[in-house]
């Protein structure tokens, strides 16, 4: 997730907020199916998952702090920020779950300020089959776009129309605003406030869930405060630190730099095949 506007300076409170928000998305993706839609059943599964998640290793973290670029000031250019501040404005980290379902599968969480776009999404990238019929195609992905423009789409590869057997990237797309054109889709905080008014607790953090979450994140935050975790810089309005692609590649994620979503003109790939 990221935003072109800093939206305030991410002091310790900002770090905590980002951690809790990321933890909620992580839980909803990885937790076991609850016994029912009852709020306590859902929150029980969140707590169970968090207790099975290992504390974040400082060796599996990439931190960044934005600098002045594109006519915008850097983080330390703010008069209220100490010139020697080591507060990160970007973080990529890896979570590991120690249970039979997810053991060995890395979960990469990324969040930052002053990036090129603001979005929240979940990307499940699938490995290539052991015997792949078509060489050099991008991996398939299931993408859940939380905001903006809620959507679920599957990145896949399809045969280019015509006599050629070449494969090109495409997607199966369910964008909510297109599928449900005549229905009002509430904003995130609208739905949350309505849940609060109606006494629905499933989207709110329980005390034991918060404690389990901090057992994962707090050691890392202490290490950052003590200057034990180095950080790099990135320009305001960029997609993050230069080493980001190298970092995620260490954990098996492959970034397809040529892919855009939504893809409406796959014919452009014909000249590159």
Residue ranges and their predicted role:
Residues 1-273:
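Secretory/organelle targeting and membrane-embedding segments
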